[in-house]
């Protein structure tokens, strides 16, 4: 856990307190239901990884002021808005260990409050006074939406390649990690070389994070991952462990995985889970995540050595610790 690492023990509480202060103020609205739902999902916590990356990227290039924490909150609002929308699309009933907003308040309210958080994020962006930051975030949110549609198109797709899978997760998940790091670098007036390094770092950390998330759907517990295990299979999502089995498993395993994905039924989970854990699907997936982490760390080589750089390396490694 990040809070057990020395740098984060010293700085994380204060940094997150500043971000949460912005979030708690910005989530308020004269429309009571917006404040109620917004506060509900924000107060569920979460790891705040993306805001932390924004803060670290800014500090890595020598920048630390109130605008940095406002941008970090903006990134969290973008993330939270996508969660609200995702839970409606996926018909999820559990998020971060609690009932989803759509489960409690209905789909319409969840979607509309997601829209509110999304537009509030853009108001926070404007406060940065940087057209480049607006440009980066406009591009990122567009690509994230494309990634979500790509994922939707691949529901039940048993012919998906590993390359296509990586493209989907880099669009829908890693792109926001990339943007989170890049806006911190831009605010800190980083050199082009350092901005690119931090941008790459975010992309690779985000890629590793999503692969591990997909691994945990077969190796984690509901209490640990904050959602129902087996959700991906129940939704017909061909994640990396399943793609590996379809390409490298026995004929019986491959056929059963294809059948389970095409029918998107949780009743198949126990059988598919047994195939996954008794094969190399999870070790292979974890090794691919480790490759992404190694690339994230290598991308920081151009930055001068510092306590913040060390913290970013620790954060990248921490994405793998969830399955160790």
Annotate each language-model stretch with its function.
Residues 1-324:
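All-alpha prenyltransferase/terpene-synthase fold signal
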């Amino acid at each position: 856990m990040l809070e057990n690492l020395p740098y984060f023990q010293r700085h994380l509480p204060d940094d997150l307190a500043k971000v949460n202060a912005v979030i708690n103020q910005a989530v308020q609205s004269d429309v009571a239901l917006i404040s109620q739902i917004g506060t509900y999902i924000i107060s569920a916590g979460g790891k705040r990884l993306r805001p932390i990356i924004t803060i670290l990227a800014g500090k890595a290039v020598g920048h630390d002021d109130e605008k940095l924490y406002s941008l970090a909150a903006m990134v969290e609002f973008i993330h939270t808005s996508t969660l609200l929308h995702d839970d409606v699309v996926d018909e999820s009933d559990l998020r971060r260990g609690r009932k989803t907003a759509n489960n409690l308040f209905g789909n319409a309210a969840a979607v509309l409050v997601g829209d509110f958080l999304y537009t509030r994020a853009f108001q926070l962006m404007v406060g940065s006074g940087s057209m480049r930051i607006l440009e980066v975030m406009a591009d990122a949110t567009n690509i994230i939406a494309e990634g979500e549609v790509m994922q939707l198109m691949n529901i039940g797709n048993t012919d998906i390649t590993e390359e296509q899978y990586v493209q989907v997760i880099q669009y829908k998940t890693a792109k926001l990690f990339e943007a989170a790091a890049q806006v911190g670098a831009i605010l800190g007036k980083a050199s082009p070389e350092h901005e690119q390094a931090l941008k790459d770092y975010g992309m690779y950390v985000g890629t590793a994070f999503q692969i591990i998330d997909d691994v945990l759907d077969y190796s984690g517990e509901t209490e640990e991952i904050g959602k129902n295990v087996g959700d991906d299979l129940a939704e017909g999502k061909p994640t990396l462990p399943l793609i590996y089995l379809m390409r490298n498993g026995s004929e019986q395993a491959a056929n059963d995985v294809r059948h389970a994905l095409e029918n998107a039924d949780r009743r198949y989970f126990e059988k598919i889970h047994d195939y996954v854990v008794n094969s190399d699907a999870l070790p292979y997936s974890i090794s691919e995540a480790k490759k992404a982490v190694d690339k994230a760390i290598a991308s920081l080589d151009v930055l001068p050595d510092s306590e913040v750089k060390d913290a970013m390396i620790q954060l990248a490694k921490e994405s793998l610790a969830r399955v160790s």
